[in-house]
Amino acid sequence: LSPGLSYGKDEELDLENLKKKYAQLQSVGFKDFAIFFDDIESERGEELGKMHGLVMKELSGFLEKDSSSSLMFCPTVYCNSFANDDISNSPYLKGLSETVPNNLPMLWTGKQVVSQYIDDQEVEELHKIISNPIVVWDNYYANDYCPTKFYVGSYRGRNITEKAIQGIGLNLTGLPLTDSINLYHLKGDMSTEEILKEFGVPQDFNVLMPFFDGPFKNSPELNTLEDIQNLINLSQELCVKWKSPLQLEWSPYLW
């Protein structure tokens, strides 16, 4: 649930409504829950952090009545850049750390919303501010901020170990087969070429691959009209001759 846009106008009533929603979901079999306080257009101050921590404390106590339930959360400050690149002086994280139960996993995207690199040292710096277990909420393959693109290249720039984090969650595209390719990348035991072959992608796509590799890979320069026309012809050929469910996902991006 994402209650942050309106939460706080009547805190007591809002909290009771949240508990009712969770109880309703529990009654039909849901066990694992998350609260998202991201993308709230308000000052990221200490009082907001304290309030969010108290909400999590109340919900955690409520859900603990069912020992099989789990709860995690995404804070409003979920990357370094939202703390002006200085998490040690973030009023929001300070307030949050004072009230949130420290056993609840917290989502974090790294230095940026879409981070080029994430490593253990960054997580260690975060743990100096707040001790909650960290789940990396990784936007490496996300395309909601660039809906005319998708990425299916290798999973790069991550040097994080199990000792530093509780887990990794990929924020993907919503395209089921494309997302399956990227889950193969996360698993890490096959090359990009092997994965694309596994999914029946024609070899001709390898020519276009540099344009769909990853968010931090520079696309090749197209210096002549002939270069551009050759790519257009290849894209059209893939759209017309290649027939598969994956092609249906990719064709709007290839035309």
Predicted ranges, named:
Residues 15, 78, 86-88, 208-211:
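Bulky hydrophobic/aromatic packing residues
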Residues 1-18, 27-31, 64-65:
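Feature activates predominantly on carbohydrate-active enzymes
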Residues 4-7, 39-43:
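A short, flexible beta-alpha/helix-coil linker loop
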Residues 11, 118-119, 224:
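A diffuse structural propensity rather than consistent per-protein peaks
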Residues 189-255:
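C-terminal functional modules
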Residues 21, 31, 40-190:
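Catalytic-core regions of glycoside hydrolase
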